[in-house]
Amino acid sequence: MAPRRPYWRGYLKLSLVTCPVAMTPATSESEKVRFHTLNKDTGNRVVSHYVDSVTGKPVKDEQEAKGYERGENDYVLLTDEDLESVELETVRTIDIEKFIPRGSIEWVYLETPFYLTANDKIGDEAFAVIRQAMEAEDVVGVSRVVLGRRERAVVLEPRGEGIVVWTLRFGDEVRPESEYFTGIEKKSDAKGVSAVEAVIKKRMQDWSPEMVSDPIQESLLKLIADKKKAKKPSKAKASKSTKGDDEEKSNVVNIMDALKKSVAKELKSRKAG
């Protein structure tokens, strides 16, 4: 996969230390199967155009503008110049405001990851100093930056020779867990916990990206390949039901019985291995 072009260029600042940096998305959707909308009768691609909701006439790109709705069919028109006039300093600067212990941000607040790197040789040293200092103190930096005309809170995490920038969801965007977890039974059966722990230890592995491969993506690629060859897509054979599946026909299952069977199955496979 070829390196992507930087999504954002600007400056990383800490106190009096500043260096030019570039930020690139850490994830990609370009390898995903994408579809076009076609006219089923002709096979031709369908295209869309913006039209005026009242006159019905097409609207050219240069005629488009932003508008804030203040009432029904009543908008405040904003030009590009208007929007640029309210740009913040964070449009081109990531000024690290504070530091927090690494790992102290709950995952639910993390949104989109970016790779942050020095953008020229002159800034390499300053960038390395900031990154190494955060690594040594085992902290992450908290800052803000404007992305897509919106100021976003971000956290900067030293990683390898670079820094990973995570955009953060704002506090009011994350629903309190207490709204959902209140009333859940706190006490658990000790034997049940021990049984689950045994299963966990058996299935413990080191992380690998292959663990989260997309089976739908693979199936789509195979379907498309079959279509290209003008063959009917092969149907996956239905998996044979196992003895365990036959035994578990009821929707109501005794948790301890299920756990005992799971542990016995894990131990049996361990001995066989």
From Swiss-Prot:
Q: Pfam families, per this entry?
A: Ku (PF02735)
Nucleotide-binding as a keyword of this entry, yes or no, is no
Give UniProt keywords alphabetically.
DNA damage, DNA recombination, DNA repair, DNA-binding, Plasmid
Q: Which GO terms describe its biological process?
A: DNA recombination; double-strand break repair via nonhomologous end joining
- Keyword Electron transport attached: no
Q: Where is the composition biased (Basic residues)?
A: 228-240
List the residue ranges of the region (Disordered): 227-251
Q: Which residues form the Ku domain?
A: 13-190
Report the GO molecular function annotations. double-stranded DNA binding
Q: Which family does it belong to?
A: Belongs to the prokaryotic Ku family.
Q: What does this protein do?
A: With LigD forms a non-homologous end joining (NHEJ) DNA repair enzyme, which repairs dsDNA breaks with reduced fidelity. Binds linear dsDNA with 5'- and 3'- overhangs but not closed circular dsDNA nor ssDNA. Recruits and stimulates the ligase activity of LigD.
How would you summarize the oligomeric state and partners of this protein?
Answer: Homodimer. Interacts with LigD.
- Protein's name in the database: Non-homologous end joining protein Ku
Lineage at the top is: Bacteria, Pseudomonadati, Pseudomonadota, Alphaproteobacteria, Hyphomicrobiales
Gene coding for it: ku
